[in-house]
């Protein structure tokens, strides 16, 4: 049986010793895909054309966590004082989402990835989350999700 190829969105950071930019993904994503019988492929940040090629190569897409989603993508000005944005990553991953939907490839998302998917589907985000913390066990990270009535997601 052919193993599914799973694209994992990469992030970037500067190597602390020599200012070389590195592409990476958290090892847990890579190991999780392997443990589930898939072949993990880290997708480094690229352009919109590259997004089309990547989606053609993979069977499924995982949108990982990371920086804030730039509010300009959901029609708002920045209202918080933060430099934790990556414009090129937003543009690239929005192109991945668009192409994955076009090619009917499943999309899984975590944290920022879920936020970006929401924005790609026309949603908005709370920028200032200080008043939106939820009480929960430290063993689990959760966020409440409001779903629309009579939708597949509500049924799940």
Residue ranges and their predicted role:
Residues 1-110, 119-121, 126, 130-156:
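N-terminal beta1-alpha1 cap of cysteine-dependent amidohydrolase-like domains
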Residues 114:
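The feature captures the ABC ATPase H-loop/switch
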